[in-house]
Structures are given as C-alpha cells and as structure tokens.
C-alpha cells in the first residue's frame, strides 16, 4: 500500500468535527496520551464521548499510598494509576456495568480490624459480599478467581486497610499471569467496558530516581510529587530509573513492540498537563519511546501546566519546553528534526496562570506553532476546562 502525507488547515473548536465524532465514537480518532496519576481522568471522561480509540500510556512507578504496600509485598510495578484511568474510561451508560464499576472503586475502611477486613475479602471470594450480589457470571466468577489468587499469595502481615478492591483484582490477575500486566488489563477493559486502551509504558518493576540541583538524590515517586511528604526545596536536575527503592541502582527499560506500534499508529500524540517529571517525563525514560514518537507522522501537542507544580520549582514555561525536548531527544539521532517530536504548544494565555510567557525566539528555534485559544472557563477556574481541552485536541485530528 502506497502512503502519502496530506496537510490541511483546521479550525480549533470545530463544532462540526466534534458532532461527527460524537455520533460515532467507536470510529473516533486514535489519540495517544503520555500521563500518570489522576490529572487526566476528567479529560478522559469527556474524551470517551467522542472517541473509543484513545490510548493512554501510564507510568507504573508510583511508590506511595496503597500501591506501595502491593509493590513491596509482590515486587511488582504500580497498578493504582492504571486502574484509575481504566475506571475513568469505563462505559457509564446503561449498556455498561455499573455494578462492576462500584466494586472496582470500593476501598476497605482505613480504620478497621484486620479480622474484619479479612472476613470482607473472604466473603467477596465466596461471592457472598453485597457488592458481588448484582454481578452476574461469568464476570462474577472471574472477579472471585482474581481475588482468590491475591488472597492465596497475600503475606500474613499484609495490611488491607484502605486497600482498593480494583487494585487487588488487578494484582491477583498479575500474579496468575506469570507477572504480566497486559492480560489482566485487557480483561479489566472488557469487564468495565473501557472505551479506549490503557497500557503501562513498561511492565518492569522499577522506581523513579532524581538528582537535584543541590547535589542530593532521592528515590521514589512519592518523594517527588509533594503530596505525601514535604515538597522539594531544590529543582530536579535529572530523572532516571532505579531497580531498588532503598538504594540507587541504575536501570534501563525497553519499550515493548506492542506499545511501540500504538505510539507509531496514533493520529495525534499529546504531552498533557500533570506532574511534569513523575507523570510526563517518566513516560519518556524507557528506550524506544522517543524514536517511536519520531516515527509517527501525526501532530504532537504539549499542554503546559497551569499554576504551581511542586515538581517544577523555578521552571519557566521556556525551561519546561526545553526540558521536554531534552528527554524526547535523548532517544533519537542527533540529526532528528525537532518537528518530528513536537509540533504545537496548546495554551490559554488570556485566562491561564503560567510560570512565564513563552519566548518567540524559542518557538522559532524549535519550529513549533503556539495555539493560543480559550481552554479555561469560569467553572474550571484555575484549571483547564476538560470539554474545551478535548474540543481543541479533537480539532487537530
């Protein structure tokens, strides 16, 4: 088959294009997002109304919260952010499975006795827990089996307080599939009717490590985000991967061919807002990500953060853009044109609070275009309006 490249003019916030996508979201564009955490979940809930073909590359490096307990107990990648994105993309219409959605979002009480929590888990495995009552077979049987696999492998001292049932189901499936995430994620997608594709950028059990400008080193995503511990006091100089959490052990990860194919075949690639280092740049660390992006002929869009990101101490918008390009270029040849990696910066300078204006000289140097358009509404206040953001991105496809 002979392929040609076609360029065209587009209208941002193209109502006709959006209407067409909304009528047949199953035929919607293949859009790919590099993200992690929960920052993109609201956008995902809007996006699924227009396309069921979005792909979400999610970081599996979270080292805090309930994910930390699972990672320590089973030496596995983090699954909390994967589960969160799967739920955000789940079918919420009457044709979906709200009873499974409710089960997968349920958390055990944080203040409960160990015996009571074990009884709850055992009742789910038996199928006698109230949350299992509305779930019919074969889904009921599948869920019980995955929880059973988790239960059988669970260390005697494992703390179930605050545990998310969806995470336990995913963990059981991971353990039952020879420590592979893809099979259980695929099953999860079918169980909750996920309207898109969610994949971990790597299946490797690794941790984020950062060298700070003051010369100190920290290991663990939870130490970067400023959510579970005090925010950083020195800017991040370099982000890398470590095999161990307690001691820096340099590690490399290779992008799998399945993920490479998803990146190369996307009609649009988005570097969205969220934790700049631990969500966005962390996705670019596996070898092969940058080259897969460069091989994609579609538009690549960067949406900078609004307000204050604890990971971006002292970073101007120019610095953020340069740092993004630095991590993208780390995986490609020196002669790779910048436009193979990034084409657009999407922002709202009138209503948005950015760290600084974007330099026209830098824009020209990188040969990119700035799309300055309304992305913030009164209801979204200090944040991007998810509907406006989705509208702008869909207009570029």
Language-model regions, residue ranges each:
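Electropositive, gly/pro-rich neighborhoods at or near active sites that engage anionic ligands
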Residues: 61-237
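Conserved catalytic alpha/beta core of Sir2/sirtuin-type deacylases, generalized to analogous enzyme cores
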Residues: 1-31, 38-56, 65, 167-270, ...
């Amino acid at each position: 088959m002979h392929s040609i490249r076609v360029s065209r003019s587009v209208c941002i916030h193209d109502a006709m294009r959006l209407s067409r996508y909304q009528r047949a979201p199953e035929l919607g564009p293949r859009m790919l997002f590099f993200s992690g955490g929960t920052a993109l979940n609201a956008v995902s809930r809007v996006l699924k109304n227009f396309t069921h073909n979005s792909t979400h590359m999610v970081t599996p490096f979270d080292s805090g919260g309930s994910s930390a307990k699972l990672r320590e107990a089973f030496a596995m990648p983090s699954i909390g952010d994967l589960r969160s994105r799967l739920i955000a993309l789940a079918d919420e219409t009457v044709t979906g499975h709200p009873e499974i959605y409710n089960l997968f979002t349920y958390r055990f009480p944080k203040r409960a006795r160990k015996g009571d929590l074990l009884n709850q888990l055992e009742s789910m495995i038996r199928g006698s827990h109230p949350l299992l009552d509305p779930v019919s077979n074969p889904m009921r049987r599948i869920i019980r089996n995955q929880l059973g696999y988790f239960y059988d492998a669970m260390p005697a001292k494992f703390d179930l307080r605050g545990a998310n049932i969806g995470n336990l189901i995913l963990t059981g499936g991971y353990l039952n599939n020879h420590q592979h995430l893809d099979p259980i994620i695929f099953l999860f997608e079918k169980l909750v009717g996920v309207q898109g594709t969610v994949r971990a950028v790597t299946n490797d059990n690794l941790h984020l490590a950062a060298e700070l400008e003051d010369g100190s080193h920290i290991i663990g995503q939870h130490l970067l985000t400023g959510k579970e511990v005090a925010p950083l006091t020195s800017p991040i100089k370099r982000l890398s991967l470590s095999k161990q959490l307690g001691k820096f052990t340099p590690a490399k990860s290779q992008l799998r061919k399945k993920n490479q194919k998803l990146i190369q075949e996307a009609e649009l690639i988005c570097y969205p807002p969220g934790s700049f280092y631990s969500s966005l740049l962390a996705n670019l660390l596996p070898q092969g990500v940058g080259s897969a992006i460069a091989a994609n002929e579609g538009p690549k869009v960067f949406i900078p953060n609004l307000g204050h990101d604890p990971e971006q101490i002292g970073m101007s918008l120019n610095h953020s853009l340069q740092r993004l390009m630095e991590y993208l270029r780390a995986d490609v040849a020196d002669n790779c044109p910048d436009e193979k990696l990034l084409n657009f910066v999407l922002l709202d300078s009138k209503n948005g609070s950015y760290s600084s204006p974007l330099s026209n000289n830098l824009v020209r140097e990188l040969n990119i275009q700035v799309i300055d358009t309304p992305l913030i509404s009164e209801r979204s206040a200090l944040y991007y309006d998810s509907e406006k953001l989705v509208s702008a991105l869909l207009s570029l496809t």
